[in-house]
Amino acid sequence: MIKAIMAVDEKGGISKGKSMPGPKNNEDLKWFKKNTLNQVVVMGSGTWADPFMPTPLKSRKNILITSKNNSIYPGADQYLKGNNILQEIQNLENIYVSQDIFIIGGSAIINKSISIVQEFYLTRIYGNFNCDKFIDINKISNTMNLIEKIDCDETCHFEIWRK
């Protein structure tokens, strides 16, 4: 199944200055690990290069979308060139049949792929972190149903959306 997982602030912001905004949120990191461990993660080169993102992510198949030479981003298990990125992501379901495919960023890839995402794991971080990259929250709520809301703590809650 193709899924996406992302943390957003109250305005749908996901990054600032090419990195995760705001203070590190341990609850969100635990949620991310719990859901993506032993699965396939798909990300763009900006997410791969984020200094707060240890790459490759351990105990996961790491797939990198890049138009650049693979040697610039060593360590990925597979590279997608992005010629027809939605089809390439969908083809991963035929390769990794026993694992979920999690799209983990960045914003352009998330926004472009919402049409093929069957479940979206959304962490709502309370506050506005003056982000410069956003995902379209309305696109999620207009095309999916909220199936679960999980209260966490005073910093965030988790939502699972499904088509």
Feature map (PLM): residue ranges:
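Enzymes that bind and transform nitrogen-containing heteroaromatic metabolites
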Residues: 1-163
